[in-house]
């Protein structure tokens, strides 16, 4: 394995890490805001219906008055308008539920607060998906251009390449990995989370808990999903960056890659078993011989270019090929990407 390529991959890993850390700040902020809004919803509910800061389950199951139902339906219209601002597509199921709610003639207090909590949860997941999509788009472009640049500078020759459009990145994101795409993975726990939120709420009513005690239980339930979301984001980032590198290899006529696991100080057994092995680009299979192989996987690939050195001789003067000097990445972007 070339030290040159190991150093390049280490640099790329650092750049990707910066994107991940920035996303995690956003994710933390989103979850904290969701918890804050759920607590506010709960406080309003207790202020309206509690006696001595307690609400019985029987009290919670009482039907809303016509005035309360009318106010709820106005809120539902606001929910629909706000959720339509997000690009996330999996919000549609809840939007359909909201549309149905506008025609209901009987709704209980418990159903009303659960609808409000589900709105907050849906808004959280939609925000999370939009933020992850943005991170993945940046990661894909960064990995793609970095790989093409390093190949061209190393070989001294380049091949015309297609710039990764937003649609191309979205297509890569929507490809199923282990049976699901990244959006499905974000939303798959929504029903379970919602059921757990309702369970904690119902337990609070049955046990005579205060709004503060119930709010703590709701926050704990939501925070349990945060760590899963963080793991998902890092694993999918590894996936999208390796997909981008693979496409970059193909764009420069590189036909083989080497599996590289040693950049990860906590290398798993499955990744160690593939470290240093060479595979054909045309036979790359995610989760099999192309990272990620497991959650939090940090393995990557490097191009096998020994057999491609003849590109320097063969390419000069041919259409679609051009000589590349020892230029900086910034200069390369200006000459070949931003032109």
What are these regions (language model features)?
Residues 98-219:
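Structured, charged N-terminal subsegments at the starts of enzyme catalytic cores
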Residues 202, 231-234:
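A broad detector of short, well-ordered amphipathic alpha-helices
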Residues 1-136, 220-221, 227, 234-339:
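Activation/maturation switch segments at domain boundaries
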């Amino acid at each position: 394995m070339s030290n040159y390529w190991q150093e390049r991959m280490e640099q790329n890993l650092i750049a990707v890490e910066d994107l991940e850390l920035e996303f995690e700040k956003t994710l933390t902020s989103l979850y904290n805001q969701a918890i804050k809004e759920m607590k506010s919803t709960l406080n309003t509910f207790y202020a309206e219906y509690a006696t001595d800061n307690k609400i019985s389950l029987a009290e919670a199951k009482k039907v809303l008055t016509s005035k309360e139902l009318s106010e709820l339906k106005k809120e539902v219209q606001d929910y629909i308008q706000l959720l339509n601002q997000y690009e996330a597509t999996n919000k549609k199921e809840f939007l359909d539920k909201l549309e149905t709610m506008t025609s209901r003639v009987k709704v209980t207090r418990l159903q009303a607060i659960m609808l409000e909590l589900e709105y907050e949860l849906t808004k959280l997941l939609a925000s999370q998906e939009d933020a992850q999509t943005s991170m993945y788009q940046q990661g894909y472009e960064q990995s793609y251009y970095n790989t093409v640049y390093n190949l061209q500078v190393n070989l001294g020759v380049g091949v015309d390449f297609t710039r990764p459009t937003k649609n191309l990145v979205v297509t890569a994101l929507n490809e199923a990995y282990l049976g699901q795409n990244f959006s499905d993975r974000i939303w798959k726990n929504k029903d379970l989370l919602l059921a757990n939120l309702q369970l904690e709420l119902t337990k609070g009513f049955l046990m005579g808990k205060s709004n503060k005690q119930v709010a703590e239980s709701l926050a704990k339930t939501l925070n349990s999903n945060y760590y899963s979301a963080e793991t998902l984001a890092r694993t999918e980032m590894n996936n999208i960056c390796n997909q981008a590198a693979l496409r970059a290899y193909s764009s420069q006529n590189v036909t083989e890659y080497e599996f590289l696991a040693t950049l990860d100080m906590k290398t798993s057994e499955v990744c160690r078993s593939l470290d240093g092995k060479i595979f054909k680009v045309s036979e790359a299979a995610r989760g099999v011989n192309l990272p990620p192989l497991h959650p939090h996987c940090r393995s990557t690939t490097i191009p096998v270019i020994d057999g491609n050195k003849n590109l320097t001789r063969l390419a000069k003067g041919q259409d679609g090929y051009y000589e590349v000097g020892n230029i900086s990445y910034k200069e390369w972007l200006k000459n070949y990407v931003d032109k």
